[in-house]
Amino acid sequence: MKHIDQVISQALILCEPQSKDSMKLHKIAQQVTDMIDKSITTIDDDRILGLSVGGSYAKGTWLTEDNDIDFFVKINPNVNKREFEQLGTRIGLSALRKYRPYLRYSDHPYVEAKIQKVRINIVPCYQVNRGQWKSAADRSPFHTIFMTENLDEKMKGQVRILKRFLKSIGIYGSQLSVGGFSGYVTEILILRYRSFVEAISLVANMNRDKQLIALNEPDPQYLPSFNSSIIIIDPIDPRRNLGAAISAESLGKFILAARSLIQSPSIGYFKSTENKFDIRVLEKVKPNLLIVEFKIRKRSPDVIWGQLKRSLTALSKQLSISGFNAFGSTCITDENEYAAFVFLVEFTTLPSFTLNVGPEIFRMRDTETFIEKKMHKLTPFWINGNMRVVTIAERNNLSAKEYLSELLSGNVSNVGINKDIIEDLRTGFDVYRGTERKLNRFIKSALSRLILNDGRIIKYQRD
C-alpha cells in the first residue's frame, strides 16, 4: 500500500494545469473582458461603475476538466433591484451574443455561455463597501481579493487536490442539485488547515458536536443562528454560514471518503468514476423502489431543482403517512425536459386493515364519539393494555404504486407539491416499481445519490 504522501504527490501532478490550458484560459478571459468593455461602452450608462474578474480562475485554483470564468459587472448601489437585474442581463447578453448566451438564476439572474467548453458567467453586483451587501453577488469580488492575498502557490495546489477529491466522489459544488462543497469552501478549508491531508484528517475525525471552521474569531452574536451540521464562517462576512448549503448526505459522504482514503491511500480517489452500481446491491433494492417519471417545461436549472426537492419532500411525507414508509428518496432531472422522483419504500403493499387506537376509556364523551363514528362499519372494538378503545380501519390503498398514481392524478395542491411541478405532472407521468422495467441512466444516477455504492468507500466482499 502506498503512503498517503506519495498519493498526494501523484494527485498534485494530476491536478496541475498544463501551460497550454493556462494560455487558453487567459486568452478567453481577455477576449471576454474586451467584449464586456465594448458592451459597456456601447450602452454608455454611468450607473455601470466597473468590471472585475473572479471565481477560481482569478484565484488560480481552477481545474482543467471543470473550469469557468466569472465576470462581475459593478453597478451603482443606488440602482433599484429591477433596473440592476436589467442592466446586468443587458450587458451579459450583448457581450456574449455570438456564443448563444442564456439566463441562469441564483438570487438574481445572470448570463452564461460557453466558449471553447469554458463556462463564462457575467454577473451583476453592486459596488459596495465590505459588509454593506445589497445582493448575494456583492461579496464575490471581496472573496477574490481575500484569496489572492492569502493563498500561496503551494496552497493553491492543495485546493486543487481537495476539489478533485470532492468532485470524484460527487459532492463538489454548492448548487441545489449537489448540496456539496463550493470552490470557495475548499479554499477556506486549505487556508485554515494548510494542507489537503490536514483538512481531510479533521473531517475523518468529526464527531456529533457541530464542527466550527473559521479563519478569524467568530462573532458570538451570530453563532446561535447557525444550525447546520458543519459551520463554516465566511471570512469577509461573519453573519454568513457557508455550511448551510452543505447537505447532511454530502457531509456524511465526505467523512466516509476521507476515512477510506486515509486507511487505504490510492490515486483512484482523484479520478472521476461513472455511477456504476454493484449489481448485487441494485438487485436487493429494486423490489422496493418506486419511481415517477414525467416531462418538465424548460426553466432555470436552479429553479427546477428547488421545485423538485420541495415536491419530493412532500411526496415522501405522504407515502409515510399512508403506511408505505419512504425511508429514502431522491430526484433527478436532465434540466431540459425529463425529471423523476425515486423512493425507497419499506412496504410496496400493505395489509387490508390498519389499527385505529382511540381515547382512554375514562374519557367518556371522547370514547362515545369514537365508537359512534366507527360502529356503522361493523368493525370490532376492544380495550388494549393501556385502557384505550381500539378498532381496525379498512385501507383504501394497499399498493404503493396505485396510491402514488391516485395521489398525483388528484388534487395535490394541498400536500406541498410545487405548483409548476403540478402543471408538469398534469401533462402525464409514469409510476412503476424497480422490478417492472429496465432502469435508465438517469434513474441509476439518482440511485447513486440515494445509496452509497462507491467501491472506494463501501468495499463489498466478492463472492
Where are these regions (language model features)?
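Internal, well-ordered alpha/beta segment that forms a basic, Gly-enriched binding/recognition surface
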Residues: K114-G170, S174, R194, E198
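Glycine- and acidic
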Residues: L14-S22, V73-P77, F294-P301
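Catalytic metal-binding acidic patch
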Residues: G54-G92, R119-G131, E337-P351
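Conserved nucleotidyltransferase catalytic core and NTase-mimicking acidic/glycine-rich helix/loop elements
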Residues: K154, V159-N336, V345-N356
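Conserved catalytic core of two-metal-ion nucleotidyltransferases
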Residues: I36, I40, Q86-W133, L319, ...
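Extended, charged low-complexity segments
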Residues: D334-D463
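Short amphipathic alpha-helical segments
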Residues: D21-K24, I28, V32, N80-G88, ...
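N-terminal regions immediately upstream of nucleotidyltransferase
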Residues: M1-T64, K81-R82, Y110-E112, C125-Q127, ...
